[in-house]
Amino acid sequence: MAELQVISTSRLRTAVRVSGDPDGIPVLLVHGNVSSSRFFDELMGLLPPLWYVLAPDLRGFGDSERLPVDARRGVGDYAEDLHSLVEAMGLAGTPVHLLGWSLGGGVAMQYAIDHPAQLASLTLVAPVSPYGFGGTKDAEGTPCFPDYAGSGGGTANPEFVKRLADRDAGQDSDFSPRNVMSAFYFKPPFHLEEERESAYVASMLQTAVGEDNYPGDLIPSANWPTVAPGKRGILNSLAAGNFNTVDIVDIDPKPPILWIRGDSDQIVSDTSLFDLGFLGQIGAVPGWPGVDIFPPQPMLAQTRAVLERYQTNGGRYEEEVIEDAGHSPHIEQPEAFLEAFVSSVRRNS
């Protein structure tokens, strides 16, 4: 059973779930957007007991301090927070195995760029594209517009944001966090048992809401869909123009990378239901300027192209696709996920 601790680092008070043997193989788990370390509860209980597993809540999530996010630095705030935790836990001189899920995948890539020698391996679970979320086209991440319109804080669904702020734990709307989790975090008809589902929803509702956190601010744009990324908050930290981890191809040393994704992910895919390019194409967002100007973002193709460059430059990576899973394969298909992840850590320890 993981123990929830609160660690005062040089940057903030960080809540972190801790399990296993402090003298064992160190493993860091970094959660995704609108979630917390609680989403790793089952996984932590299934990992080898001789591993030393740490799963922090990022700033503004879970039980960690609600500090603002400077999106002009991409996910730099989160990556530096993570490094301060590693230092506070006495692991700065020990290579760790770092896993990042979704937003956490972006944080993990930035951490690898900043501290490559500190990683024994890197596992990316349904990660954000190295070119960010929204506003780009083609495998090279070409911007659809110079101001990266179509990404950032202004692209969040306002009804979901309102219900998150209102701490709506019910299910009377498609935009209630509980229903959003069931419909998009997982591949329907997957459902958690009620107690665990409610615990996850409660952790979603701990998300700090506002321009400094979720979703962030916005800048009006003359380009479709009339919003461009702002400078504050979570969605802007992932927005094209602010976020870019392509430099991972040049890091030295190059830890081995395991890329794990579900075969039915609706959030990070080449046809994402959260990408305005795809939503415009299917008629869900009016005024779409067409496939030549704003096609669906090829998120998987972008990630694969960057990882291929990583491999060409002397690194190595594996792509593992988990069948019958959506955006959360570690929850939906824990046995298949464990087999891939545990094998990778053991090979590289």
Predicted stretch roles:
Residues T9, L58-L99, L103, I113-D114, ...:
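Active-site loop/oxyanion-hole signature of alpha/beta-hydrolase fold enzymes
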Residues T9-S19:
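A short loop-to-beta-strand scaffold at the N-terminal edge of the catalytic core in hydrolase folds
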Residues R17-A71, L85:
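Conserved HGGG/HGGXW glycine-rich cap/lid loop of the alpha/beta-hydrolase fold
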Residues V27-L29, V53, L99, I257, ...:
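Hydrophobic beta-strand anchors of alpha/beta hydrolase catalytic cores
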Residues V107-Y111:
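Hydrolases whose catalytic domains are alpha/beta-hydrolase-1, hotdog thioesterase
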Residues T123-V125, P130:
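A short, hydrophobic beta-strand element of the alpha/beta-hydrolase
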Residues T142-Q302:
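Alpha/beta-hydrolase
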Residues D275, G280-S349:
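Catalytic active-site module of serine/aspartate enzymes centered on a nucleophile-bearing elbow/loop
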